[in-house]
């Protein structure tokens, strides 16, 4: 059981550290967003206003964005803040990441899928994500390479800014879909390693899901906020969105 003094210390450290990290990260990401916006509008052809055309453009935008140096900078800033905070926590509380030596690399958003919200005022968004995962087996002493895939879910609605009276895109909570997470071995391994992975698969899924959510969700937020609000509004207002979405997804 965690001693009381450690709990008090943890709360104090996290309060001060998290405030500082959030301030620094906010300033860094604010600068990054300014760099991302021109990337979205550079070298892209004009598309029609049908839902299919708009969603295809979003997919192209997302692909271009992830290859840009600005996106890599945003990912780096988010990872630095998360790593610093985890270092503070790990000194007091052991985590599954420490126990398994788990590392995430080459995370990639593959697609963007949309479905209308029932009230017709927004969209439910799904972002399929893949990543490479390495695990250092504490018992077997070998590095295990895995491929992870999952869906990150969020929703976006169009609301009126009370100060400017202009439409703005408001993004809801971003979280992983627990039913979508899958892990697969990349290489052939012995029966011992297969048994080890199977014995801890639920713990690994939970940890990988949490890490990818923390890394990618801030970038999804940047991506949505970098879009022209009119593009999102067109998707929301399209009267044939249900039929066309089903053909895309």
From Swiss-Prot:
Task: Give the Gene3D superfamilies listed for this entry.
Answer: Bactericidal permeability-increasing protein, domain 1
Q: What UniProt keywords apply to this chain's record, in alphabetical order? A: Antibiotic, Antimicrobial, Disulfide bond, Glycoprotein, Secreted, Signal
| SUPFAM superfamilies from the UniProt entry | Bactericidal permeability-increasing protein, BPI
User: Is-annotated flag, keyword tRNA-binding?
Assistant: no
Supply the name of the protein.
Answer: BPI fold-containing family A member 2
The record's similarity note reads: Belongs to the BPI/LBP/Plunc superfamily. Plunc family.
GO CC aspect terms: extracellular exosome; extracellular region; extracellular space; secretory granule
Signal sequence, start to end: 1-18
Q: Which organism is it from?
A: Homo sapiens (Human)
Give each disulfide bond as a residue pair: 174-217
Q: What does this protein do?
A: Has strong antibacterial activity against P.aeruginosa.
Query: From its record, what is one biological process in GO terms?
Result: defense response to bacterium
Annotated glycan sites: 124, 132
Cellular location of this protein? Answer: Secreted
Q: Which GO terms describe its molecular function?
A: lipopolysaccharide binding
What is this protein's tissue specificity according to the annotation?
A: Detected in submandibular gland. Secreted into saliva.
């Amino acid at each position: 059981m965690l001693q009381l003094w450690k709990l008090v210390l943890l709360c104090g450290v996290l309060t001060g550290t998290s405030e500082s990290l959030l301030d620094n990260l906010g300033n860094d990401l604010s600068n990054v967003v300014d760099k991302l916006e021109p990337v979205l509008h550079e070298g892209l052809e004009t598309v029609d206003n049908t839902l299919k055309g708009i969603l295809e453009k979003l997919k192209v935008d997302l692909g271009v964005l992830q290859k840009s140096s600005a996106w890599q900078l945003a990912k780096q800033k988010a990872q630095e803040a998360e790593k610093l905070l985890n270092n503070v926590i790990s000194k007091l509380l052991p985590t599954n990441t420490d126990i398994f030596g788990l590392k995430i690399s080459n995370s990639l958003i593959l697609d963007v899928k949309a479905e209308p919200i029932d009230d017709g005022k927004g969209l439910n968004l799904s972002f399929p994500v893949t990543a490479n995962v390495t695990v250092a087996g504490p018992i077997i002493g070998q590095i295990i390479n895995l491929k992870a895939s999952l869906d990150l879910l969020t929703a976006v609605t169009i609301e009126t800014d009370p100060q400017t009276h202009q439409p703005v895109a408001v993004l809801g909570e971003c979280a992983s879909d627990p039913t979508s997470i899958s892990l697969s071995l990349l290489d052939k391994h012995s029966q011992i390693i297969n048994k080890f992975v199977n014995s801890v698969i639920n713990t690994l899924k939970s940890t990988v899901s949490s890490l990818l959510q923390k890394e990618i969700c801030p970038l999804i937020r940047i991506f949505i906020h970098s879009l022209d609000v009119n593009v999102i509004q067109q998707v929301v207002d399209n009267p044939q969105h249900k039929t066309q979405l089903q053909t895309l997804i």
